[in-house]
Amino acid sequence: MNAPLILLTAGGTGGHLFPAEALANALKAAGCRVALATDKRANAYAGSFPADEIVEIPSATPSGRSVPQIVKAALMLAQGTLKASAVIRQMKPVVVVGFGGYPTVPPVIAASLLGVPTVIHEANGVMGRANRLLARRATVIATGFANIKGVPANVPGRMVQTGNPIRPAVLEAARQPYAGLSTDEPFRLLVVGGSQGARVMSDVVPPAIELLPEGIRSRLSITQQARGEDLERVRAHYSKFGVTFEAEPFFKDLPHRLAQAHLVISRSGASTVAELAVIGRPSILVPLPGALDQDQAANAKTLEDLGAAIVCPQTEFTPERLAREIQSLFQQPDRLTRAASAAHSASIADAAERLAQVVLQLVPSQHNGKSP
């Protein structure tokens, strides 16, 4: 008997693909085959994705307000649903799992129309628009947080909290305990802006470092993710005042660097928050502004409420404010240690296995021999 095939579908950014990758590893360990349906943005990440097959499904985000934009997006989603239907008929997955973003809409709708069980996973503290659209069709809704907002009526009875699946590389990095800041080692600062970078980090962090007293600045060792177009000015700024730094558009070993950090300055996407919790590192979080759902603000609040993070809205994220926060934490290293411990208390390290069990419970009985 062939191993059951599970079709995962995710938008082509790290925030959607990383938890899908973690689930794929857990499902393969349980004896399943895995395929991935995504969009063209996934090329930067798909090379390491443990899928037996990867297919590109047309999609669009209906974000415009004009009638032509809405019609164009609707037509793209309809086209994607037709292609997804053909893919599902050909591949014959036994369950389809969506990880949010509009690229998941065509495969999940197609699966529900064809009678294939579906799971959607909501990683954020507020249910996203695509998942809200799919929630009433989904067989099960898995969540990263216990009490998420924006859930449609008549859905909560099908919800289960699994946590946000974590990649093996992050779990490996989590084995390194937080060392705390001592007087004879560098103060390691990690600055990241999510999988797609964030210009505000390049605008604010280097000038903030320049404002710090020389005694603190000389102790810093900075690793900063910067967009390609911002890279030279970030490097030039740090070089100007002699701080130890490394700046690149992308770090393949980011989990290792996260584990090495004494303090992380970051956006607060769901994957980032989950990784900060599992590895257990203190952070200054700057939620992405302008999002309709304010999902990053909700994610950040979960760590702030535990004392694991300082949350700074982007309107208040100035060089002066950031310099004050860094100086205060440097001068009170026990705060960093307490925040690291608080972050770790929020972790669900086995979230991938929990979600895999939810998926495997939907596998038809003729395949049950492949389930644990």
Task: Walk through the language-model features, giving the residues of each.
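Glycosyltransferase specificity loop/lid
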Residues: 4-75
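Donor-nucleotide binding loops and adjacent catalytic segments primarily
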Residues: 24-29, 36-37, 42-53, 57, ...
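Active-site-proximal region of nucleotide-activated glycan assembly enzymes
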Residues: 33, 41, 52, 112-175
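An amphipathic, basic-hydrophobic alpha-helix
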Residues: 66-95
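Acidic donor-binding loop of glycosyltransferase active sites
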Residues: 93-95, 259-273, 281
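C-terminal "capping" alpha-helix adjacent to the active site of nucleotide-linked donor transferases
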Residues: 310-313, 317-334
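A short, well-ordered alpha-helix in the C-terminal region of glycosyltransferases
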Residues: 335-349
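C-terminal alpha-helical cap of glycosyltransferases
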Residues: 348-372
